[in-house]
Each structure stands twice: as structure tokens, then as C-alpha cells.
Amino acid sequence: MKIRVGHGYDVHRWGSDKPLILGGVEIEHHQGLVAHSDGDVVLHAVTDAVLGALALGDIGQHFPDTDERYAGADSAELLSHAVSLCQEKEFKTGNIDVTIVAQAPKMAPHIDDMRSSIAQCLKTCIDNVNVKATTTEKLGFVGREEGIACHAVVLMESF
């Protein structure tokens, strides 16, 4: 069995009137994230991790923000495309660990729904998906509530 590891990172700034979607879950908040797509910083980081694990580039190469076809795109569909590329290379998700870095809103009430959504996109069981959140103790752009960041690390296994 071959094992590959990928890391993804994404950031979006606050300032949109679009709904806030994180990990495929709509979260009530007074503003959304500015982005060409739906702005799901969590699924963008996960997509980059999956693509990176198999040396398939990054989300920007596959879905450029200069391409109007992806304006308002559902990030779950982008991740599903990345997963299909992995399946073509005969790899599946071993496990994934996600860290959301945000001062607000509180993520705890939404973690289980995010785990379920991510597991569905990755075609894996929820036990293979971990999502956690932290703040920056009011430091930096996240602490000033200018945006949200997300890290994702994925282990992919050959089948």
C-alpha cells in the first residue's frame, strides 16, 4: 500500500453579504466571506490537501478565480472533482484533520455537521474526519476579525 500526505491552507476575508458556508454547512453570521466561489474556506483547504497529496497542483490551477464558470461555485462540487481525480489514481482518504482559525462565530455547534459533510464529499466514514477550531487570541487578521483561515492535512492510501 502506498501512503501520501497532503496539506491545504486557505484564507478568506469577511465582507460579503453571501451566506457563511464552512465545511459545507451554512452557519448563521452577520456577514459572509469574500470569494469568487461560495467562499467555503474549509472545503478549499481540504481540496488543496487532497490535490497536494497526489501532486495534482492546487485548487487555483483546477478552478481559477478568473474563470466565470466557477463564480459562486459550490465548494463541495470542487472537492468532489478532486476526489474523483484521486480515485482515478487509485487512492482513497485514510483520514483528514482540519483546523479552522477564526475569532467568530463559535464553531463548536457546527463541528459534527461539518465532519459529516466532509466525510460525504471524501466518500469516507465520519470516523476518518476530524474538525476543530481555534482563535488567535485576538492577534493578527483573524483576531481583528478581518477573515478566517483553515488548515487541512489528509492521508491518502492506495487501493
Swiss-Prot record:
Binding residue positions for a divalent metal cation: D10, H12, H44
Keywords: Isoprene biosynthesis, Lyase, Metal-binding
The EC number(s) this enzyme carries: 4.6.1.12
Name of the molecule in the record: 2-C-methyl-D-erythritol 2,4-cyclodiphosphate synthase
Pathway: Isoprenoid biosynthesis; isopentenyl diphosphate biosynthesis via DXP pathway; isopentenyl diphosphate from 1-deoxy-D-xylulose 5-phosphate: step 4/6
Oligomeric form and interacting partners: Homotrimer.
Annotated PANTHER family: 2-C-METHYL-D-ERYTHRITOL 2,4-CYCLODIPHOSPHATE SYNTHASE, CHLOROPLASTIC
Cofactor note: Binds 1 divalent metal cation per subunit.
Lineage, highest ranks first: Bacteria, Pseudomonadati, Pseudomonadota, Gammaproteobacteria, Alteromonadales
Matches recorded under HAMAP family: IspF
Keyword S-adenosyl-L-methionine belongs to the record: no
GO molecular-function term, one example from the UniProt record: metal ion binding
Function comment: Involved in the biosynthesis of isopentenyl diphosphate (IPP) and dimethylallyl diphosphate (DMAPP), two major building blocks of isoprenoid compounds. Catalyzes the conversion of 4-diphosphocytidyl-2-C-methyl-D-erythritol 2-phosphate (CDP-ME2P) to 2-C-methyl-D-erythritol 2,4-cyclodiphosphate (ME-CPP) with a corresponding release of cytidine 5-monophosphate (CMP).
Family recorded in the similarity comment: Belongs to the IspF family.
Residues bound to 4-CDP-2-C-methyl-D-erythritol 2-phosphate: 10-12, 36-37, 58-60, 63-67, 102-108, 134-137, 141, 144
Cofactor: a divalent metal cation
Reaction equation(s) it catalyzes: 4-CDP-2-C-methyl-D-erythritol 2-phosphate = 2-C-methyl-D-erythritol 2,4-cyclic diphosphate + CMP
Organism: Idiomarina loihiensis (strain ATCC BAA-735 / DSM 15497 / L2-TR)
